[in-house]
């Protein structure tokens, strides 16, 4: 059955037109769903009984089931179950009046980065648009209890957003548009490992969302060791596509850089990064490595973390040191799901 959360308003208008209904009914339906969070069409009381019944028969209104919520200070992590029994996770980070939701886009991930728990799973499947939107509905329902709203969305959970392009783009429209979640494009960030052709495609979508690129190394030799796809999409070409995106959208690009001890946190790595980004519309997020048992990498020493940051800052690079709020409750990429499956006796 078609899940209504996969549809944009124009598509619903067309369907309703075919049913002989006026187009404003679509606005009423979306108002119930996205503003009042009503997911039972029978409760949409300003619609005729016939239309309510028809909606019930034609569409599914299902959202993912919450299996477990873990919380630690500012971070809440939701382990969700999809209709086919697969698990995904969504993270809510509440900080300084902001409620940022980190959504997943795939069950597992095909990229296989050598520092990521999700990379160990491999790709099981892409999420449908409604499964991405459903994650936001679950969290908005939870936030509603304290009369708060989602303010920011980051595509930074399980999976590579640009490897599930069509569903991700559609979900961004639903999140962004007034008839949907009505969250402005500057509050939406898509984080990618760097699938170059899709970055160019994204630049042409006129979405003007923020783009973050997981760089994690300042030369191809190092980057290819932890991000296999770098062999196909090397750093120079990746940066070219990123700066094209910046030029097209007027938004500087964020480069995520996970600092790993004695691997990419040395003085020469910082200097090399400066050479790549100096004078460019770029911002660097430094993230000290969040240890995953399955990988040998160690967390950088504090003095090396601060030295790295200082070299960038002193060279005029915009840089932020980000402490991962999720790390204490295993909110890093894919870790809660991995733990859950382990407890269920499944292998990942
Ligand atoms: S870091 Fe991102 S792209 Fe790489 S394996 Fe993990 S989820 Fe996939």
Swiss-Prot record:
Family: Belongs to the radical SAM superfamily. RlmN family.
Annotated residues for binding of [4Fe-4S] cluster: 109, 113, 116
Positions bound to S-adenosyl-L-methionine: 159-160, 191, 214-216, 290
Additional observations: Reaction proceeds by a ping-pong mechanism involving intermediate methylation of a conserved cysteine residue.
A GO cellular-component term linked to this record: cytoplasm
GO annotation (BP), single: tRNA methylation
UniProt-listed Enzyme Commission number(s): 2.1.1.192
Lineage of origin: Bacteria, Pseudomonadati, Dictyoglomota, Dictyoglomia, Dictyoglomales
Gene3D superfamilies: 1.10.150.530, Aldolase class I
Protein name: Probable dual-specificity RNA methyltransferase RlmN
């Amino acid at each position: 059955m078609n899940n209504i959360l996969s549809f944009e308003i124009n598509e619903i208008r067309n369907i309703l037109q075919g049913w002989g209904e006026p187009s404003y009914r679509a606005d009423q339906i979306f108002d119930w769903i996205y503003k009042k969070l009503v997911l039972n069409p029978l409760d949409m009381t300003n619609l005729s009984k016939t239309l309510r019944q028809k909606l019930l028969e034609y569409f599914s209104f299902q959202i993912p089931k919450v299996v477990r919520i873990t919380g630690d200070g500012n971070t809440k992590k939701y382990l969700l179950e999809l209709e086919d029994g697969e698990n995904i996770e969504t993270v809510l980070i509440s900080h300084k009046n902001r409620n940022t939701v980190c959504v997943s886009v795939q069950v597992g991930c095909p990229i296989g980065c050598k520092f990521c728990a999700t990379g160990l799973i491999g790709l099981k499947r892409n999420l449908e648009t409604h499964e991405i939107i459903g994650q936001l509905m679950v969290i908005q329902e939870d936030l509603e209890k304290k009369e708060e709203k989602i303010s920011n969305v980051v595509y930074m959970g399980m999976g590579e957003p640009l490897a599930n392009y069509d569903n991700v783009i559609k979900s961004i429209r639903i999140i962004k548009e007034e008839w949907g979640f009505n969250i402005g494009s500057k509050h939406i960030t898509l984080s990618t490992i760097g699938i170059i052709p899709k970055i160019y495609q994204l630049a042409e979508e006129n979405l003007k969302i923020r783009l973050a690129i997981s760089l994690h190394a300042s030369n191809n030799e190092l980057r290819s060791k932890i991000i296999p796809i770098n062999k196909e999409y090397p750093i120079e070409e990746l940066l070219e596509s990123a700066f094209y995106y910046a030029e097209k959208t007027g938004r500087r690009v964020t480069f995520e850089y996970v600092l790993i001890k004695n691997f990419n946190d040395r003085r020469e790595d910082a200097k090399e990064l400066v050479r790549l980004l100096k004078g460019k519309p770029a911002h660097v997020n430094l993230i000290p490595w969040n240890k995953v048992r399955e990988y040998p990498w160690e967390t950088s020493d504090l003095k090396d973390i601060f030295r790295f940051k200082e070299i960038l800052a002193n060279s005029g690079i915009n840089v932020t040191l980000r402490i991962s709020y999720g790390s204490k409750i295993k909110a890093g990429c894919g870790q809660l799901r991995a733990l859950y499956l382990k407890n269920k006796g499944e292998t990942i």
